[in-house]
Amino acid sequence: MVVIRLARGGAKKRPFYQVVVADQRRARDGRYIENIGFFNPLAKDSEEAVRLNMEAYNAWVAKGAQPSDRVASLAKAYNKSAAQTEATA
C-alpha cells in the first residue's frame, strides 16, 4: 500500500521532516516515490513551518494513498491557513 508520511532528516535534537509518498514496506527514511513538502517543527515565527504541494497530495489521496495521522492534520491546517491568506489578500 502507498502511504503519505514524514521522513525524518535534520540533526540530533533538531528534527526536520520531508513529506513523502512511499510504499509502506519501505523504511521510514528509505526510498520514496515523490517528495511533496516539508515540516519544520522548530520553526520560529518568521520561518515557514510547513509547505505542502496540495495538488500532489490530493492526487495521491485520490489514487488511494493513505496519509498518516500527522500528515493528515498538517494538510488540514495548511489548507486552512492557505484559505485564510487567500481571503485576506
Curated annotation (Swiss-Prot):
GO terms for biological process: translation. InterPro entries: Ribosomal_bS16, Ribosomal_bS16_CS, Ribosomal_bS16_dom_sf. GO terms for molecular function: structural constituent of ribosome. The keyword Ribosomal protein applies. Pfam families: Ribosomal_S16. The keyword Ribonucleoprotein applies. Gene3D superfamilies: 3.30.1320.10. Keywords: Ribonucleoprotein, Ribosomal protein. One of its GO terms (cellular component) is small ribosomal subunit. Belongs to the bacterial ribosomal protein bS16 family. This is Small ribosomal subunit protein bS16. The lineage of its organism: Bacteria, Pseudomonadati, Pseudomonadota, Gammaproteobacteria, Moraxellales.
